[in-house]
A protein has these predicted regions:
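Intrinsically disordered, low-complexity coil/linker segments enriched for acidic/polar
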Residues: 81, 120-121, 259
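Transmembrane helix interruption/hinge and helix-loop junction motifs
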Residues: 48-52, 120
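Alpha-helical transmembrane segments
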Residues: 122-134
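Juxtamembrane transition segments at transmembrane-helix termini in multipass membrane proteins
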Residues: 1-14, 19, 23, 53-77, ...
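Charged, low-complexity, helix/coiled-coil-prone segments
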Residues: 5, 98-110, 206-208
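Juxtamembrane "helix-exit" motif on the non-cytosolic side of transmembrane helices
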Residues: 109-118
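Juxtamembrane helix-entry segments on the extracytoplasmic side of multipass membrane proteins
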Residues: 120-123, 221
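Interfacial aromatic "cap" segments that immediately flank transmembrane helices
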Residues: 13-45, 78-106, 134-186
Length: 261
């Protein structure tokens, strides 16, 4: 199904976090063809160069979702200025990714310091990791603001306060979405794990001096497992983006209702 002007889905509408995820999953599944139409260059690039390819894919997807926020429906055709907007959104997606990397580095460094320098190191390290993760959780809302709005990057820092005000919904939403993505990625890595285990056993047997007969189609199996992994990765990113866009719109709708009251 492709969204048209007769089938509007308003993004900025107050919804529960569970409703955002349910609607995000169904909308992402219904518009898989539209997403492919808008993002196929980055998908093909990711098969060869995963890192820049995935960033460009996220940028193209964010641009599509921003148009959905403005129009009320997911546009089937890409606008003429779409490539320029793709580059703009890819840069904002890269900024969002760098924020996540910075937060992970800070949490990891503090966890390591707690384990090394504090008594009961392992216990204190676990406590530090949990506490810092909960403190940093509102940053998720800030990264959504970076990806789905046109606000200048310094202004997007206010998204942290927005996430703090809606901390309960953000925590429940993040945990549920994390479990869904975990299931998707476990399914995607299953073929690759089988291929890796078989390759490791064959390599160990060869080192032990045994004669190992490698199937003729084995290289194709390795390539197929890699492609399957990328497909599931794209699926997880797409589901996350659709759900995040709806959750971001829902939070903004709640904020607008509070201001009116």
């Amino acid at each position: 199904m492709e969204t048209n002007t007769e089938n509007h889905i308003k993004v900025r509408e107050a919804r529960s976090y569970a409703r955002c995820i349910k609607l995000g999953l169904s909308t992402a599944a219904d518009h898989a063809g539209v997403v492919w139409t808008h993002t196929w260059p980055s998908v093909l690039l990711s098969l060869v160069l995963p890192f820049p390819g995935l960033i460009i894919f996220i940028g193209q997807l964010d641009r599509l979702l921003c148009e959905w926020s403005e129009l009320g429906f997911v546009p089937r055709r890409k606008p003429l200025e779409g490539w320029r907007m793709d580059a703009h959104r890819s840069m904002r997606a890269l900024v969002s990714l760098l924020v996540f990397v910075f937060i992970i580095c800070v949490i990891g460094s503090c966890t390591w310091a707690a384990m090394v320098y504090l008594p009961h190191g392992k216990l204190m390290a676990m406590a530090a990791m949990v506490i810092l993760t909960l403190v940093a959780l509102p940053s998720v809302m800030m990264t959504m603001e970076v990806e789905y709005s046109d606000s200048p990057l310094p202004v997007c820092r206010a998204g942290w306060l927005t996430g703090f005000r809606h901390y309960g919904s953000l925590l429940a939403y993040s945990l549920l979405l994390f479990m869904i993505n975990l299931l998707i990625m476990l399914a995607g890595t299953f073929p690759m794990n089988i291929v890796t285990m078989a390759s490791t056993q064959a390599w160990q047997a060869a080192l032990a001096g045994d004669t190992v007969m490698t199937p003729t189609m084995w290289p194709l199996a390795i390539i197929a497992s890699y492609i399957i992994f990328l497909i599931f990765t794209f699926s997880a990113i797409t589901v996350t983006a659709f759900c995040n866009n709806l959750f971001w719109g829902s939070i903004h709708a709640r904020e607008a209702e509070k201001k009116q009251d």
